[in-house]
Structures are given as C-alpha cells and as structure tokens.
From Swiss-Prot:
The encoding gene: thrB
Molecular function as annotated in GO: ATP binding; homoserine kinase activity
Name this polypeptide is given: Homoserine kinase
Pfam families xrefs: APH
Organism per entry: Phenylobacterium zucineum (strain HLK1)
The organism's place on the tree of life at top rank: Bacteria
Length: 323
C-alpha cells in the first residue's frame, strides 16, 4: 500500500455522500507497498480502507477484483468487503481515478514469519483457493509466464545497469522457464501476491488476507510457489526448508496436492522469483519522486533466482515434507 494521489477533505466528503457510512472521523495515508494509493478511513460507521487505483491496475479488471473480494467474504474467507453505495455500486471515482472503500480487516501482519506462521499461512492459502471455487468471473494472469519474455525485453538494459552481466543470466532464466513450464496442473483463482504483508494473524492464527489486486486464474500451485519465495527465505538469502515444509503441510491439511503439483514446485518457484524480480526492477526505476513509498529491492529476488538455479532440490525437499 502507498500514497500517490492526495485527497482533500472536500473530495472525501463528496465521495462519502454516496454511502451510508456516517461522517468521517479520521483519514490518513498508508505509506506501504508500491501499487495503489491507500488511506485508513474511520467514520461513524466503522473503519475502512479507501483505495485509489493507480496506473498498473486496469479499470476493466476492477470488477473482477472487487467481485472476488465480495465472493470470498460471502463464502467464509476473511478478506476486506467492498462497500456498495446507495445505488449498489462498489467502484467509484475520485480525482478522475477509480476507487473503492473496503471494510477494515482486523489482525496483524508479521515482518519475520516463524515456522508456525508459515504453517498457518499455508492453511490460509488453501482456504482461499477453496473459497474461490465457483467464482464466476475470470481474469488471465497478465504477469504470468507468457509475459516474462516481453517484459524482460523492455527491462534488459535496466538489469544490466543494476548488475553488470545480469541481463545475460536473466535471459537464460526466461528461455529455460519457457521450455520447462508445467502444463495440465489444476487451475483456479489465485492470490498471486501472497506475501507476509498481505496476510493477517490474530494470536498466531491465520486471520485473513488483503490486497487482491493481482488475483487471477492460473495454476494453483504457482500461488504456493509465490508464497515459498516470500515466506521461506532468511535475511541472509538462505532457503529455510523447515519453513517450506510447514507451509506446504499447512496447505495440504486443507487441500492435498497431487504428485504432479508437488513435483512442479521447484520450477514454479523459479518462475515466481523471476516474475517478482522483473516487476521490482520496473518499479525501481519507475516509482515517482515524492511518493510516500520506497520501491522494493530487485536484488533480493535476483538472489532468490540464484538459489533456484543452483539448488532446485531445496524446494522439492520442502514440498516432500507434507507426506
């Protein structure tokens, strides 16, 4: 979450006039993340998050994102509930940009997940996948495997400036993953950004997930791979097999994996690391000056890519533990 678009008191009052949420009591920007402008809003009717959607989020995708969040909330999964105005509309406009007001989800994210947190996160991810079954809308993953080659073509000079020789290494990753990307694995709605800052806990127990603005239809095990990269690497860059085993075991306690899904996790994790390296590389150079946001370091994911290149069995060892 971040702030790129400022909103005046008058603009907020005009927006809230369409809702039955009561008068505003407090309103402040949230300076985290890199994607949209987010504000913590407290009114007489409760606590909410106001999100103003910036350039990366396409307006035509917003009905999918908001519809999914409402679907999950109505099917027993804890996520923010988009608020509808008096006319039944969830999607509004402020400063010429689309926006939405979503209920505040209680709980805390963790900066340094423990093995127990990883197990709970795995359970939560499987619960999300199950709750999303039957959601009638569809959205392709525009940051999936097919997008990486053209994305890298645009960013290869930035990669070389970041670290001399890196462009050639990443080019090999792109080609290798295109050759080895798995086919025929179970698909469904995935979160696609299941990082610790998007997952909430209460007293160590999974309490819900937020930030569904990369959600799409893709290989479900790819969501696990994203999570393995996000949750199971230590600060020194090493892969924590115990944490990975806990995450996969937690997932399988709710939704068992097939042998094919488990076997594919190393290549899926390699691909997930490439996806986040590329988008971080883009953000590193594209984040506007003066925004209340610090872009995330792409070299963190360059180091994770190196682990997947040289030691793919580490992920497989982690995946095998749920048996």
């Amino acid at each position: 979450m971040a702030v790129y678009t400022d909103i005046t008191d008058d603009e907020l009052a005009k927006l809230l006039a369409d809702f039955d949420l009561g008068a505003p009591l407090s309103f402040k920007g949230i300076a985290e993340g890199v994607e949209n402008s987010n504000f913590l809003l407290e009114t007489e009717g409760g606590r909410f998050i106001l999100t103003v959607y910036e350039k990366r989020v396409r307006a035509e995708d917003l009905p999918f994102f908001l519809g999914l969040m409402r679907w999950l909330s109505e099917h027993g999964f804890a996520s923010g509930l988009p608020m509808a105005d008096r006319g039944g509309e969830m999607l509004k406009t402020v400063r010429g940009k689309p926006c939405a007001i979503v209920s505040f989800l209680p709980g805390l994210s963790v900066r340094r997940p423990t093995v127990a947190h990883c197990r709970e996160a795995g359970k939560g991810l499987a619960a999300l996948h199950n709750a999303a079954d039957g959601f009638p809308m569809r959205r392709e993953n525009d940051l999936g495997q097919g997008a990486w080659a053209p994305m890298f073509e645009r960013l290869k000079d930035d990669a070389e400036r970041l670290k001399p020789g890196l462009a050639e290494v990443i080019a090999r990753d792109v080609a290798d993953l295109a050759d080895r990307w798995p086919q025929g694995l179970p698909e469904g709605v995935i979160h696609a950004d299941y990082f610790p800052d998007n997952v909430f806990f209460k007293e160590g127990v999974f309490a819900g997930a937020i930030d569904f603005y990369f959600a799409c239809n893709d290989i479900r095990a790819y969501d696990i791979a994203v999570a393995l990269n996000a949750w199971c690497f230590e600060a020194d860059g090493s892969f924590n097999i115990t944490a990975a085993r806990a995450l996969v075991a937690g997932y399988e306690a709710v939704r068992p994996l097939s042998e094919a899904e488990r076997a594919a996790l190393p290549v899926l994790a390699h691909g997930a690391a490439l996806r986040f390296f590329l988008t971080r590389l883009h953000d590193w150079h594209a984040t506007p000056a003066g925004a209340l946001v610090k872009p995330k370091d792409p070299l963190e994911y360059e180091r994770k890519l190196a682990v997947h290149r040289t030691s793919p069995d580490l992920v497989l060892f982690g995946a095998a533990a749920a048996e």
